[in-house]
Amino acid sequence: MLIARVTIMKALFIAALLMLMMSAPARADPPKLAVFDFELIDTSLEGEVNGPRTDEHDRLMQAGDQVRRELAESARFQLLDIAPVNAAAHGSNLQACGGCDVQYAQRLGADLAITGVVQKVSNLILNITIYLRDVHTGDLVTAVNTDLRGNTSESWSRAVRYLVRNRLLAPNYGAPQPQ
């Protein structure tokens, strides 16, 4: 009798557990995200006189890689490989091309697209802006930015880390919640 009661209790527990699991909402797949390489707008006198610097070009590539890596690690996005459109993207001015970033992201099957711009005012004063767009509508979801001091790999990395952790991964992408 005791064995039958324990068996019935186990069966009821398993049935209840199965019902709970089946009634739980299904998790949607994370949105597909294309993160393009960052671009530089150099308004400094140094840039006008000396032209492009290889260390800044390297930092631009590292910034895009860092955004991709940190967003992939968050598991909130499914990162897409931009290689199929990368050459075309590099031939465009993504931050001012009238939506070509969205078109490239559509070709990849993305839901969202990120572009980034570093504006160099001087070798001391820079600004990083990251734009997140809805690929289906072309609408800007958010634009996040920060100023940084010092044109070093460390300062760029810290600025990117701040924007990803405190803005892009924040609820509502860091924007105030509607009341």
Task: Please describe what each predicted stretch is.
Residues 1-9:
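N-terminal secretory signal peptides that target proteins for export/translocation
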Residues 23-25:
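N-terminal signal peptide c-region/cleavage motif recognized by signal peptidases
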Residues 72-115:
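Short, solvent-exposed, polar/charged sequence segments at loop or secondary-structure edges
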Residues 28-45, 65, 73-74, 102-107, ...:
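C-terminal/domain-edge helix-coil "capping" segments
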Residues 48-58, 90-91:
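Second-shell loop/turn segments in exported
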Residues 53-85:
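N-terminal, post-signal-peptide region of Sec/Tat-exported proteins
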Residues 12-21:
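Bacterial N-terminal signal peptides
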